[in-house]
């Protein structure tokens, strides 16, 4: 949620920054016009309530003076004022709902350092990394080897990814991990969680269903309600699209102790997504599923520390890819490509040799006080004694299924086996996956 005072006091600047976020020109004008109506109604209501108090005093004085005529007139005036107040309250309730709805659909404003542009073609690469010794792996070849297979083909050949039965049981974009596939997925997320714990994150095991209020606090609702899986009576609960929702809401409606900040938390959870806008995209494989595992990182910080913490969180995500020795690059997203609640986002994209391109595997964002305002998450400043909104940061560390897919593609061998990355071997228990040990 944006600060309405900032929008009022910096109208032109705010309007341009919203246009940069692909908000239509005129949307802010409508919001501020309704906000002024709301404030005008509040002033009128306050004046009428003050008048009601005066009339109440007049009634009391007239009764004490036994002036029945004056008392009856004052009572009549009271009834008139009460009716006016009731009418104003109705108008005020309607305009407040309108203002709140409009404000809830406005995205966060981008940090000035974010590249301005309407789409992903304006994203800017920050850095690129690959292992120094690729040891004959696919990325080492200047030309794609003829034996190279897509991750879903490898998985099906080895019998470790079962898409056909996933579709039979649940429909499109579902699968079973089988044998070594399930063990590899488990090895990957246990490795990720251990790495984040070493970096100071506290691990949580969260609910997988949350209230609509929780989805509102993190910015998923109301704008993206069609992308969510709503469940329960009257659709009062939602399956989480990311552990970010449960992690941020862990401290919703709370005042944190300043000594707790920065607070680092992490969780593994399934993510449930409708993928409403993904028709025809990535119809095969692990890239785009309705249910997938993801390790999420969240931070609560003081405002002055949040961008330094954003850089640290990005490094924490990069650390996973570097230890897995997977080639990747980091891009800074443009104003038109960032998520709804973000003020700045870095995407980490890992190399997929069969696609000859990088694919997103992590998105790391600073939402500044956008979520904290919606979720009423504050801390008391020890110097001023005043309450301040925290800044919240979130990042994938990483999407587990996409990491498995990247490993299958980047560690495949000509004989059809998969070499297990060295850091995963203590978790997986073997150094290769072959047809002999796939189950």
UniProtKB/Swiss-Prot annotation:
PROSITE patterns: AA_TRNA_LIGASE_II. Keywords: Aminoacyl-tRNA synthetase, ATP-binding, Cytoplasm, Ligase, Nucleotide-binding, Protein biosynthesis. It is found in: Cytoplasm. Pathway: Aminoacyl-tRNA biosynthesis; selenocysteinyl-tRNA(Sec) biosynthesis; L-seryl-tRNA(Sec) from L-serine and tRNA(Sec): step 1/1. ATP binds at residues 273-275, 360-363. It catalyses: tRNA(Ser) + L-serine + ATP = L-seryl-tRNA(Ser) + AMP + diphosphate + H(+); tRNA(Sec) + L-serine + ATP = L-seryl-tRNA(Sec) + AMP + diphosphate + H(+). GO terms for molecular function: ATP binding; catalytic activity, acting on a protein; serine-tRNA ligase activity; transferase activity. One of its GO terms (cellular component) is cytoplasm. Its main location: cytoplasm. Belongs to the class-II aminoacyl-tRNA synthetase family. Type-1 seryl-tRNA synthetase subfamily. Catalyzes the attachment of serine to tRNA(Ser). Is also able to aminoacylate tRNA(Sec) with serine, to form the misacylated tRNA L-seryl-tRNA(Sec), which will be further converted into selenocysteinyl-tRNA(Sec). This is Serine--tRNA ligase. It comes from Oenococcus oeni (strain ATCC BAA-331 / PSU-1). The lineage of its organism: Bacteria, Bacillati, Bacillota, Bacilli, Lactobacillales.
